[in-house]
Amino acid sequence: MPQFDITSPVALARGSYHLITLVQRECEKIFSSMGFNIEDYSEIVTDYECFEALNIPKHHPARDMQDTYYLDNGQLLKSHTSAAQNAILKKYGKGLIENGTPIKAIFPGRCFRNEATDACHENTFFQMEGVMVDKDISISNLIYFMKTMLSEVFKKDIKVRLRPGFFPFVEPGFELDISCLICGGEGCPSCKHSGWLELCPCGMIHPNVLREGGIDPEKYTGFAFGLGLTRLAMMKYGIKDIRVLNSGNIKALKQFK
């Protein structure tokens, strides 16, 4: 039997962060430099947090079992980072009302939806929710912060567009699209051959959501966005299939050291 010297020094393989972690930390740094607080929130939430506090009525299709993972105890896996909005509004609302300190916070995390996977959809994905509430906040403030963030992430001006979109917790609501950097806007499977990739649902926080969070919508307005970190990572690193990110392929991850 061959003898082995287990005390002999060996070369240690260097680890690396997952590219979603890299993108998340970069976004956190950017928003932090603009005065946003970074918050964490549970992946298991209540029906109230995920739906009722966000102006989503009982009959809304987002509550359908085919979209949301429900647990036996009545709680659920959060289907969007917006589930933290109510808690954030209540946490920072006192400072806004008593001291005039704007509410500015981001809260990244995993989201879960019971849906089929393809090149641009997964049942587990990462988002970064952001909110800002103060007097006289408008859509122009939302556009400014999102354009600033994207320019910092990609180190150049990025072509974006706003499309009208319906989300019960914002009014008006929009879809923020980014020109597909994988195909240069010409069309590919990742962007469904449209030249655009949906990146971020956003809009002005609905008065009912502000009111539920203890904020008077007659005095204050605010915006919210749900930035898709997974898709942002795809765009930044030129990944054509979202499923690669959760594949556990060490060879693929090593290139992002």
Where are the regions that the model predicts?
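TRNA-recognition modules of translation machinery and tRNA-sensing kinases, especially anticodon-binding
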Residues: 1-257
